[in-house]
């Protein structure tokens, strides 16, 4: 019994001495966080803190010397350039629509698509969000979805921003490639630059003078939303087509004051009854209104 007690005490003391030494080692202390490991991080997985070109240290004139006055100047400017509140960006895909006719003008929501938009509007109303801005793609199906949602939430239609940059398109050649969908290279070049411009327009940390958390609703399209998610989370943008989101679903991204981005919902449509869950264009036109 005495030997067992001595063994336990000795082992405990040994572990205590080991961890005490690890804590005293600054380099080892970094690895005490559960978010770190001893395995080297692949370069592509490293977070770019200046992804939105609004990292305070990139905006402030660098220190010219180590004098107290210069350090005070630098610290004051750095603090002034920092965001203080979070931005919430809620993305809604349009409802189901019919791809008939030769132009976007004929691509109206189906009855099911209108019902989907109604459920989404009710869900957004239940969340009790006070919207700072609502932006909608200029395509018919997004405009109709936006109009239906606006009937459920408190926001003046005249204040909605209509943005052509958000129109559906082919953002970037997907990986892995798919055989059933092969846009021309020129389409990727044309659409990709536009959709990337839309991302840069709407995704960034708050301005330093923003005094409260803000909420922006964007009503758009599946390809655009999926690309936005990959870009915002700094995942390989080529993987956008691996994500599937339902019609009129809700995707919620939050940009913290530090510039870190997290996702709260991805294609959430659990608030709809099962018979309304769709994600593809209906092919049986005869049975769809």
UniProtKB/Swiss-Prot annotation:
Give UniProt keywords alphabetically.
Hydrolase, Membrane, Mitochondrion, Mitochondrion outer membrane
- The name on file for this protein is Serine/threonine-protein phosphatase Pgam5, mitochondrial
What is this enzyme's catalytic activity, as reactions?
O-phospho-L-seryl-[protein] + H2O = L-seryl-[protein] + phosphate; O-phospho-L-threonyl-[protein] + H2O = L-threonyl-[protein] + phosphate
Report quaternary structure and partners: Interacts with Pk92B/ASK1.
Belongs to which family?
Belongs to the phosphoglycerate mutase family. BPG-dependent PGAM subfamily.
Alphabetically, the GO molecular function entries are: kinase binding; phosphoprotein phosphatase activity; protein serine/threonine kinase activator activity; protein serine/threonine phosphatase activity
Q: Known InterPro entries for this protein?
A: His_Pase_superF_clade-1, His_PPase_superfam, Mito_Ser/Thr_phosphatase
Q: What does this protein do?
A: Displays phosphatase activity for serine/threonine residues, and dephosphorylates and activates Pk92B kinase. Has apparently no phosphoglycerate mutase activity.
| SMART domains assigned to the protein according to its UniProt record, in alphabetical order | PGAM
From the UniProt record, give one GO term of the biological process aspect: positive regulation of mitochondrial fusion
Q: What pairs make up the disulfide bonds?
A: none
Please give the coiled-coil regions recorded for this protein.
Answer: none
Q: Which Pfam families match?
A: His_Phos_1
Instruction: Recite the lineage of the species.
Output: Eukaryota, Metazoa, Ecdysozoa, Arthropoda, Hexapoda
User: EC annotation?
Assistant: 3.1.3.16
User: Where in the cell is the protein located?
Assistant: Mitochondrion outer membrane
Return the CDD domains for the record. Answer: HP_PGM_like
GO cellular-component term (any): mitochondrial outer membrane
What is the predominant subcellular site recorded for this chain?
mitochondrion
List the source organism.
Answer: Drosophila yakuba (Fruit fly)
């Amino acid at each position: 019994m005495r030997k067992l007690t001595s063994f336990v005490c000795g082992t405990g003391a040994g572990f205590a001495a080991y961890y005490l030494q690890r804590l005293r080692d600054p380099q080892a202390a970094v690895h005490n966080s559960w978010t770190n490991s001893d395995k080297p991080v692949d370069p592509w997985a490293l977070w770019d803190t200046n992804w939105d070109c609004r990292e305070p240290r990139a905006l402030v004139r660098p220190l010219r010397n180590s004098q107290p006055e210069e350090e005070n100047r630098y610290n004051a400017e750095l603090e002034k350039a920092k965001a203080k509140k979070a931005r919430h960006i809620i993305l809604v895909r349009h409802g189901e629509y019919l791809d008939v006719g030769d132009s976007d003008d004929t691509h109206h929501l189906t009855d099911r698509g209108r019902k989907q938009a109604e459920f989404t509007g009710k869900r957004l109303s239940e969340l009790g969000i006070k919207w700072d801005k609502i932006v909608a793609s200029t395509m018919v199906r997004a405009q109709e979805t936006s109009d239906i949602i606006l009937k459920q939430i408190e926001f003046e239609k005249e204040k909605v921003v209509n943005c052509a940059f958000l129109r559906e398109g082919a953002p970037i050649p997907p990986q892995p490639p798919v055989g059933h969908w092969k846009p021309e290279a020129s389409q990727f070049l044309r659409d990709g630059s536009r959709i990337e411009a839309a991302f840069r327009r709407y995704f960034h940390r708050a301005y330093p003078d923003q005094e409260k958390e803000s909420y922006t609703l964007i009503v758009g399209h599946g390809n655009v939303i999926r690309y936005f998610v990959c870009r915002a989370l700094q995942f390989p943008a080529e993987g956008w087509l691996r994500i599937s989101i339902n019609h009129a679903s809700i995707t919620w991204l939050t940009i913290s004051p530090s510039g870190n981005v997290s996702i709260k919902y991805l294609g959430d449509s659990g608030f709809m009854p099962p018979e309304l869950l769709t994600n593809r264009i209906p092919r049986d036109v005869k049975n769809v209104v």
